């Protein structure tokens, strides 16, 4: 019953054996061809652009994205820079106000992509002009001469709810400057360059250029004595892009390369043992970026995952080939023969691991998140490129060097054999342990599985963009301060559509907006709301000489239209932020504290429940804005990763069944593959660690990496059983043959991923720690659980040689 499977694997092995011999004999042709492909990939990669905007996540036909584009057409960008300040004397100190007036002008004149800047020095103010008119003017058009004059203005402003909490705190200790932007994170890269010819590097793009300009202005000596807390969309997004792509990622990549290099030197102790694997990884990366350029995609947010994945795959393939080559080089003393024998044994499992890993990644191509779907395709291409490079470029590197005589003296043979003796002895002891305690191992894993399943039931899916930053990053601290003391830094927008031009002038529509606004204000996370209703009430009150009894919506459509006409003729412009040009649509903006997406989603759900209970009659409403777009993105990526993991698991299971032509073996091999994910997720559940959009990447990545080790060990075990006909002897032979490579690969990857602990991004840090844990658990499962299952279930068929009663070898 094992014959056909054995013949298939042997036949595939002979193909790779021939490839190894041909590559050795024609190494210069292989090298030239490889560099030609490399050069072509580099040429194609030069056409790829960097685009980390929100637009990189959504397809143009996505309804949520389409709604946001409609909102942008009506109301322009909703992104802001929010600068809260504190100084001796408070926000209404005359000297401080002079500095803020100067700051406001500087921001308007010098910051790229600014639409408008509002502070206490220039905020639009409205008051009555009896008997039947109003005055609309900038607050400090005529700057007060004395502190007393400024206090008179203060008393007027503090009576207006529109300003309190947004431009000035209720106790007047804090003030704020709001920098409205003309661009947003969804805009194409062509529209956010500062210098049209300056390229697509982050320093030339919005919001980085705007953030840098604001920071430079705030640090000028003329503003000494004022403490600034710079937050808002511009500060948060610019910091994220800069820290992740220009500061954190290059350092972590360099550190990871250094650690992996030192590990390879320690293990192989020769240049080819280091240069070869990195040439494989570099080739795979070049092909991946070349695919991006060929298809016409952009390098986006998710691209940062690709180097990590390809390092793992490329190093794993290389270590298996190098380890096997070392064994046969010592045994045969001839490089060509050692290469042929190595590829005969390692080539088929490397191909299978590459195919299953690529298939696992391709399962993510069904994601509604554009950048995730793209990552799936170019990562799969990189995985296959790493495999091709492993059996060609790496072979070329191994072909160089002195030949070792196969008839070397026994003394030299023993000296070579001592290399790796300690690890080999440990692996043999491990095999003995599994044989002796296989039942205990199975029971222990079963108990851990049950406990992990319980832990998984306690897992929550949640994300918090702010806590992606470590507390060392200033923008995290400033944002938390702003959220605690002023209006929030997170924005959710509701758009009310009356269905007709001038329909917003209908009092019934305005009352519906007011009703939803009051409902939103009941939520603990909503710190401030803005709508056309606030302005209409202010206009009505101003027409009645500031009488608070008239801080209400006018009774008739005609009166609303008259008030708006007078307001605009008086120079009022603020209302344009809340009304479409045809008066058909109006916005309600909620400013919220930046916190977990589940809590922010609770705001939307509360309003949805209110609208279900009390439906709108005069208008329709939709939720949008950059904040709502982010909530939708997190929802998309969360469930697409869960879906992707399930698809990857199914695809890999089917491939394992096909490879071994056995449902039993295929399903059996998946137990050690899913065990790392189950155990780690269960541990997270018990520890109260939630799954965010970043940590959710662990499952499909872990399955892709875990299956590699399983395939290598399973195929070797199957091969050795076919030769020996004895499960115990086959286990010893398998651990001796492939165990060393599995241990070395896993150890190198664990150390490499643990370099993420030095990240200043907490999300990246936790991802590295969890992925290292998954790899370590996967190795334990492959070394303990899988052999115990095979010894118990005997999936390769009956033994043909009676096993010794002793468990020792």
Predicted regions and their residues:
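Hydrophobic, glycine/alanine-rich multi-pass transmembrane helices and their short helix-loop junctions
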Residues: 263, 351-394, 653-657, 679-690, ...
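Helix-loop junctions and hydrophobic alpha-helical segments within the transmembrane domains
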Residues: 328-355, 721-743
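Short helical (or helix-break) motifs at transmembrane helix termini and adjacent helical loops
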Residues: 309-330, 350, 357, 392-393, ...
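Hydrophobic transmembrane alpha-helices
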Residues: 261-265, 281-282, 298-319, 362, ...
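Signature of alpha-helical transmembrane segments and their immediate interfacial
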Residues: 3-50, 396, 404, 412-464, ...
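Juxtamembrane segments of multi-pass membrane proteins
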Residues: 432-558
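Extracytoplasmic
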Residues: 69, 73, 98, 144-270, ...
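Interfacial segments of transmembrane alpha-helices in multi-pass membrane proteins
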Residues: 245-299, 366-370, 643-689, 758
């Amino acid at each position: 019953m094992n014959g056909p499977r054995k013949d298939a694997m042997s036949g595939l092995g002979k193909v790779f054996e021939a490839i190894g011999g041909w590559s050795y004999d024609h190494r210069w042709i292989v090298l030239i061809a490889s560099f030609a492909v490399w050069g072509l990939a580099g040429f194609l990669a030069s056409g790829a652009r960097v685009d980390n905007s929100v637009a990189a996540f959504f397809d143009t036909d996505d309804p949520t994205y389409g709604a946001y584009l409609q909102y942008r057409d009506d109301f322009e960008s909703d992104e802001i820079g929010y600068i809260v300040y504190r100084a001796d004397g408070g926000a209404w100190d005359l000297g401080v106000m002079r500095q803020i007036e100067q700051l406001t002008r500087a921001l308007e004149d010098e910051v790229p992509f600014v639409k408008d800047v509002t502070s206490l020095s220039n905020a639009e103010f409205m008051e009555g002009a009896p008997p039947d008119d109003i005055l609309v003017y900038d607050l400090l058009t005529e700057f007060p001469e004395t502190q007393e004059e400024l206090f008179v203005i203060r008393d007027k402003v503090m009576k207006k709810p529109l300003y309190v909490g947004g431009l000035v705190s209720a106790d007047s200790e804090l003030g704020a400057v709001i920098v409205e932007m003309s661009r947003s994170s969804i805009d194409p890269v062509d529209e956010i360059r500062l210098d049209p010819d300056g390229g697509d590097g982050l320093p030339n793009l919005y919001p980085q250029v705007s953030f840098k300009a604001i920071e430079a202005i705030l640090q000028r000596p003329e503003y000494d004595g004022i403490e600034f807390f710079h937050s808002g969309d511009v500060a948060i997004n610019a910091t994220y892009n800069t820290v992740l792509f220009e500061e954190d990622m290059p350092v972590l990549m360099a550190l990871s390369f250094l650690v992996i290099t030192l590990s390879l030197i320690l293990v192989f102790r020769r240049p080819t043992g280091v240069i070869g694997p990195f040439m494989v990884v570099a080739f795979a990366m070049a092909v991946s970026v070349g695919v991006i350029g060929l298809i016409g995609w952009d390098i986006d947010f998710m691209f940062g995952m690709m180097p990590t994945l390809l390092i793992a795959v490329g190093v794993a393939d290389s270590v298996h080939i190098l380890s096997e080559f070392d064994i046969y080089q010592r045994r045969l003393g001839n490089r060509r023969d050692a290469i042929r024998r190595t590829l005969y044994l390692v080539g088929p499992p490397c191909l299978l691991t590459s195919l299953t890993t690529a298939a696992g990644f391709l399962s993510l191509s069904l994601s509604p998140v554009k950048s995730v779907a793209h990552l799936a395709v170019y990562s799969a291409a990189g995985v296959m490129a790493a495999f091709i490079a492993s059996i060609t470029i790496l072979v070329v590197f191994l072909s160089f060097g002195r030949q070792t005589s196969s008839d070397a003296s026994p003394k030299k043979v023993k000296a070579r054999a001592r290399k790796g003796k300690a690890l080999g002895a440990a692996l043999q002891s491990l095999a003995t342990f599994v044989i002796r305690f296989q039942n205990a191992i199975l029971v222990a894993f079963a108990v851990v599985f049950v406990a992990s399943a319980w832990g998984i039931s306690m897992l929550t899916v949640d994300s918090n963009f702010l806590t992606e930053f470590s507390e060392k990053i200033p923008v995290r601290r400033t944002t938390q301060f702003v959220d605690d003391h002023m209006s929030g830094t997170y924005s959710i927008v509701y758009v009310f559509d009356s269905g007709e031009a001038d329909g917003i002038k209908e009092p019934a529509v305005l009352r519906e907006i007011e009703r939803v606004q009051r409902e939103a204000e009941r939520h603990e996370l909503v710190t401030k709301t803005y709508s056309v209703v606030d302005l209409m009430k202010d206009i009505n009150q101003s027409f009645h000489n500031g009488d608070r009894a008239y801080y209400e919506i006018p009774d008739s459509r005609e009166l609303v239209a008259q008030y708006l006409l007078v307001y605009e003729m008086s120079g009022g412009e603020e209302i344009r932020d809340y009304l479409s040009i045809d008066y058909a649509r109006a916005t309600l903006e909620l400013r919220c504290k930046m916190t977990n997406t589940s809590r922010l989603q609770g705001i939307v759900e509360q309003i949805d429940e209110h609208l279900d209970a009390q439906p709108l009659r005069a208008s329709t409403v939709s939720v949008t804005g950059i904040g709502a777009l982010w909530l939708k993105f997190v929802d998309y990526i969360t469930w697409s990763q869960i879906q992707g993991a399930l698809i990857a698991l199914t695809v890999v299971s089917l491939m394992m069944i096909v490879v071994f032509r056995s449902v039993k073996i295929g399903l059996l091999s998946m137990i050690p593959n899913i065990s790392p994910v189950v155990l780690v997720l269960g541990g997270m559940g018990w520890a109260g660690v939630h799954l965010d959009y970043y940590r959710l990447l662990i499952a499909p990545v872990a399955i892709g990496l875990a299956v590699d080790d399983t395939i290598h060990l399973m195929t070797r075990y199957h091969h050795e059983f076919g030769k020996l006909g004895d499960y115990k002897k086959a286990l010893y032979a398998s651990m001796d043959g492939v165990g060393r490579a599995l241990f070395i690969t896993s150890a190198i990857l664990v150390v490499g991923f643990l370099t993420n602990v030095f990240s200043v991004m907490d999300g990246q840090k936790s991802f590295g720690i969890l992925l290292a844990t998954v790899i370590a658990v996967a190795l334990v499962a492959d070394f303990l659980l899988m052999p115990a299952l095979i010894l118990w279930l005997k999936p390769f068929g009956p033994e043909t040689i009676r096993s010794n009663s002793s468990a020792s070898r």
